[in-house]
Amino acid sequence: MSSDRPSGARSNESEPAGRVKARGSELLDALERHLPGSRGHADGTAAYAFAAAVGLDLERDQAEAVREAARLHEVGNVYVPARVLVRLPGELTAEDRELLDARFASGAGLARGAGIPDQVCQWIRASGERFDGRGPAGLAAERIPIESRIVRVACACDSALAAPAPAPGGASSDERRRIAVHALRAAAGSELDPRVTAALATMLERGAPAP
């Protein structure tokens, strides 16, 4: 059965939704203290993930659950030294890569402890997987939940838009979108799901603003 068929997000705690959401916000507060700027990236990733989920015709409640997974997808970064999180890929050691691979499972555990629905926690864990199967658990293509693939592309989208401008003086919004689209399409089929990438890239090409 294709993993593109979404399954409902089930709560692992019989608690009011507002209390659970507040606990999720506490995780983000801790992450922001650990690495300033993380909350902005979480919010941006969540916005792009929701837009992609709606564009791919997921049901509204499923799209909302994807947004929550995207919002919390990097809370496991609190277990990774900040100096490692800001290193460029070519500067990472083998130990650094192990920490970075483990952060998604760690983040899923933190989210589960905060009462986040089990299915959302699974999506957080799988959001570290690569479409080509070279991620932490070796899942590839449709073995990765569609929700996790959406989160991965949304994360890459927000990161690309936030990247420093290549020329002095910065770049216009149109130029940033063009650069982001190029980066997303270049990673499609290797790191990123091509279908999800195409959906978000098309939104950017049509002038969708940053969230």
Regions found by a protein language model. Give the residues of each.
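Short, low-complexity N-terminal regulatory "tails/caps" that precede and couple sensory modules
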Residues: 1-22
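Histidine- and acidic-residue-rich, metal-dependent catalytic cores
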Residues: 15-211
